[in-house]
A protein has these predicted regions:
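N-terminal presequence-like segments and the immediate start of the first folded domain
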Residues: 1-83, 87-101, 106-157
Length: 157
């Protein structure tokens, strides 16, 4: 059985083109690539100011301009994307421990260590299988630093 994602999943950005945000095929749930675009504000997450204060503090906001301006964009986008994956998996009836595979696309591979720190917050136990790829660019603009696809094993109940 294959079903499309609900069109009105709260807080989940709709795709930028004609494709499903996620699909279920039997016990598997496949998420399309998720980028750091805030659907409520119609804007790209560019730093700590674009995510909740609690999240910014958790992922490493220091309050020092030179540190925050350098690491803030990738840390904030990483948190935002992984939180959207969490929300989507929960909307499908699962939890992050159901995620079995991630494919991570980076504009700059040197961002991987910062992303990895954030990913550990969402996967504190055994991490999912993972593929990391560097790409030259992502839609819709050059401000997008990361895109993540997820696959979850979520048996039908």
């Amino acid at each position: 059985m294959t079903t499309a994602s609900p069109a009105t999943t709260p807080g989940i950005a709709q795709p930028l083109a004609r494709y499903a945000a996620w699909r279920r095929a039997g016990d598997m749930v496949f998420l399309s690539g998720i980028i750091a675009v805030d659907p409520a504000a119609s804007r790209i997450v560019r730093g700590y100011a674009d995510i909740p204060d609690e999240a910014a503090t958790l992922i490493g906001r220091t309050g020092e301009f030179s540190s925050d301006i350098k690491e803030g964009p990738i840390l904030a986008q990483s948190w935002y994307v992984l939180d959207r994956i969490r929300q989507t998996i929960e909307a499908a009836g699962g939890q992050m421990s159901d995620v079995i595979k991630l494919v991570q696309y980076f504009k700059h591979l040197d961002h991987f260590p910062q992303y990895s720190r954030v990913r550990k917050l969402f996967f504190p136990g055994e991490p999912p299988a993972s593929t990391v790829v560097e790409v030259t660019g992502m839609l819709p603009t050059a401000d997008i630093l990361i895109e993540v696809e997820a696959t979850a094993y979520l048996p039908l109940r």
